[in-house]
């Protein structure tokens, strides 16, 4: 399953914390890292982050990076990966280098920064024992598949327009194969190790000492179920052309986490600054066929009474729209 939590407060910096849990293992992702967004995340979770993915490198999306880096800078228990749009390596390299690394020769952590464009992923490696001073170019890898793929999760990037390069991220769990209990009852069968063999694609399975062909049992008993999914899109232009482009890319995604920077009345200002309104976000959720819309990244220009109006405007188009948990008093 995918569990996600919006970090940070309304009208302040936000981030998204996601855990993919297959029951056999976990993958943890941090999407953006604004100022103080890690304050409510337990230290052991920050230290267990597998990937930090930036939408872009404006200050309100990276201001909390020092907090993340401070507890992970010499991490060798797992790989250290940072992701972002073109230009991310140059900016993030300065963040890595921006300390007095007088003990660096005794330290051994490796960090990789991946820049994602439409065609490829360009990766640079940085070594702590070199005080991160050398950007080792590991080349470009064509984007022929997901950015990240683990047994629990796959991550893809969606290019966005924010007066410069910006990325949205789509996270999908693998599909699941479940056993139909009614089918077991109908066939008068008892669960056992043979079900694992059936799921694994065996041609025959042994049930109560009898060898039986697997194909008819598979048709009667196994049901495929799509895995959970979510998308995170923030700081982007959402005009009619972008709605038409993005909706098919997000088709089938269960939950959309979208910025809610502007009220509908300020649509012109949103377009000028390459941000969205709550109505536009709701329209995208409806066109993409999402089941839920979570709005975040509110502008400081609005007060709580305005937030309620902004949410009502979104719900008029997409009833399953909401803000992050407890952002509105009484919710």
Swiss-Prot record:
The record's free-text note on cofactor binding: Binds 2 Zn(2+) ions.
Which InterPro entries does its entry note? Metallo-B-lactamas, RibonucZ/Hydroxyglut_hydro
Q: Which cofactor does it need?
A: Zn(2+)
Residues bound to Zn(2+) 1:
56, 58, 162, 235
Which Gene3D superfamilies is this protein grouped with?
A: Ribonuclease Z/Hydroxyacylglutathione hydrolase-like
**Residues annotated to bind Zn(2+) 2:** 60-61, 235, 297
**Which keywords fit this entry according to its UniProt record?**
Endonuclease, Hydrolase, Metal-binding, Nuclease, tRNA processing, Zinc
Active site (catalytic residues): 60
Q: What is its EC number?
A: 3.1.26.11
The record's similarity note reads: Belongs to the RNase Z family.
Q: What is this protein called?
A: Ribonuclease Z
Q: Which organism is it from?
A: Deinococcus radiodurans (strain ATCC 13939 / DSM 20539 / JCM 16871 / CCUG 27074 / LMG 4051 / NBRC 15346 / NCIMB 9279 / VKM B-1422 / R1)
Gene assigned in the entry: rnz
